[in-house]
Amino acid sequence: MSQDGKVKTTESTPPAPTKARKWLPVLDPSGDYYYWWLNTMVFPIMYNLIIVVCRACFPDLQHSYLVAWFVLDYTSDLLYLLDIGVRFHTGFLEQGILVVDKGMIASRYVRTWSFLLDLASLVPTDAAYVQLGPHIPTLRLNRFLRVPRLFEAFDRTETRTAYPNAFRIAKLMLYIFVVIHWNSCLYFALSRYLGFGRDAWVYPDPAQPGFERLRRQYLYSFYFSTLILTTVGDTPLPDREEEYLFMVGDFLLAVMGFATIMGSMSSVIYNMNTADAAFYPDHALVKKYMKLQHVNKRLERRVIDWYQHLQINKKMTNEVAILQHLPERLRAEVAVSVHLSTLSRVQIFQNCEASLLEELVLKLQPQTYSPGEYVCRKGDIGREMYIIREGQLAVVADDGVTQYAVLGAGLYFGEISIINIKGNMSGNRRTANIKSLGYSDLFCLSKEDLREVLSEYPQAQAVMEEKGREILLKMNKLDVNAEAAEIALQEATESRLKGLDQQLDDLQTKFARLLAELESSALKIAYRIERLEWQTREWPMPEDMGEADDEAEPGEGTSKDGEGKAGQAGPSGIE
């Protein structure tokens, strides 16, 4: 159907279906409602995976709670049916846009294998109860076909949870439990088929005291299966062919399961180490370097303490590398939500454009300083400014002991040194010693990054320079005369640059004109040489050459006037 046809159909729809659509909205496959529905479907699927097999292999369990099983069976069937309805109301992405047209959703769903599996899982095989009796739960094995829905729920949870590694381990343990559970059920069913107590391998005769209880039957079977699959204990030797086949199958399953478990655990551990390496610096390399270079123990202890502080307090120093795979705009939004409030406290950045602050936020570099470490010293060249995120810094004298002031969270320093303010008496050098009292977390903004951003915002640059001038005036650090001299020098330099630009433009124009004249002269000479060659060899000259030559040199043709002009110009030239 065309787009126009869709519009007409929507407009002609009566109010009743519109109201129905409100009650049955289209779900976003990445939304919360769809996620929680997937988690709801975990329960009926796990019920069928665990209980149905157990009921089929342990007759006492099936007979003792028949009514409860019927209630749970048809409750799970109802959820299966509702799940198909949810699938008919779950949108999908097409060219990045969520499709909410229910006709398109239904058409797409019924053409997938998922729809066929969902239908097969709801085939009413229970109708055979009428002929075979209600104690054959194996008729419900087709409910296992809904297992892909379980895997989808696990994948979504692993993506959303804050502890993905713990969830992976829990999921692996669940798989191990299901495998051992199924194996124990098959072991008990095989023992019943071969005869209880016929040899040491099968389940003991229920006539013995204690072995007739259902709980003992299941726990014994589960224990026996655990011994076989984990190969950690002695088990009775098989005696019959069926027992040998069962043991061989279990041993093969144990080998494959052991490889799977080891691979999964290795993957989890590797992911944990990779995450730590991405968030925190690798201290092992630094420790090895210090050992090879014979760094003194005191300095080595400080370095180790710094790494330990980062690890214990979850401090990150490489946010750029962590967020590098995000799209630029999304990375900017994350950085803005984390750091914009801190940057807004800086006086020279107040009332600046929001887009400017967003770009500056991406340039902030987190740094952590140890107790007693100098952030900057008096006289150092200032190439960056600092914003205190957490901790305390002291303005100290040259002796490093006398404190003039203490700077806390939210304060900043060094902002004047990264802005080129004319007349700044201190230039771009530090005017104080700043030392960290404890562990301090700072944000660093370099002069190069600020200059790069301000190149796109000249108006904001002028506003910042004006604010910097006001700050310097209050501090009596602004030389007005020097500022005027620098401004005059800058204006003179700009005037000279404009003059040079104008001269350069004139030279380029003259060069282009001369180049055009040179090309024209070369073309005329080429035509003349070719014409002389034809005349020298007394060949009949082509008409097009004569016409082209006449057009190129109207004063030097074959006419008498042309010959006279040529002779006047220099008769010996042709000779």
From Swiss-Prot:
Reactions this protein catalyses: Ca(2+)(in) = Ca(2+)(out); Na(+)(in) = Na(+)(out); K(+)(in) = K(+)(out); NH4(+)(in) = NH4(+)(out)
Tissue and organ distribution: Olfactory neurons. Expressed in olfactory sensory cilia (at protein level).
Site note Central gate, residues: 258
Residue ranges of coiled coil: 493-547
Cell division in keyword set: no
Residue ranges of the motif IQ-type: 292-302
Residues annotated to bind a nucleoside 3',5'-cyclic phosphate: 348-471
UniProt feature, compositional bias: Acidic residues: 544-554
PROSITE patterns, sorted: CNMP_BINDING_1, CNMP_BINDING_2, CNMP_BINDING_3
Superkingdom in the source lineage: Eukaryota
Cytoplasmic face of the membrane: 1-38, 92-116, 160-166, 274-575
Annotated 3',5'-cyclic GMP binding sites: 414, 417, 430-431
Matching SMART domains: cNMP
UniProt keyword terms in alphabetical order: cAMP, cAMP-binding, Cell membrane, Cell projection, Coiled coil, Ion channel, Ion transport, Ligand-gated ion channel, Membrane, Nucleotide-binding, Olfaction, Sensory transduction, Transmembrane, Transmembrane helix, Transport
Swiss-Prot/TrEMBL domain comment: The C-terminal coiled-coil domain mediates trimerization of CNGA subunits.
Record function comment: Pore-forming subunit of the olfactory cyclic nucleotide-gated channel. Operates in the cilia of olfactory sensory neurons where chemical stimulation of the odorant is converted to an electrical signal. Mediates odorant-induced cAMP-dependent Ca(2+) influx triggering neuron depolarization. The rise of intracellular Ca(2+) levels potentiates the olfactory response by activating Ca(2+)-dependent Cl(-) channels, but it also serves as a negative feedback signal to desensitize the channel for rapid adaptation to odorants.
Family, as annotated: Belongs to the cyclic nucleotide-gated cation channel (TC 1.A.1.5) family. CNGA4 subfamily.
Protein name: Cyclic nucleotide-gated channel alpha-4
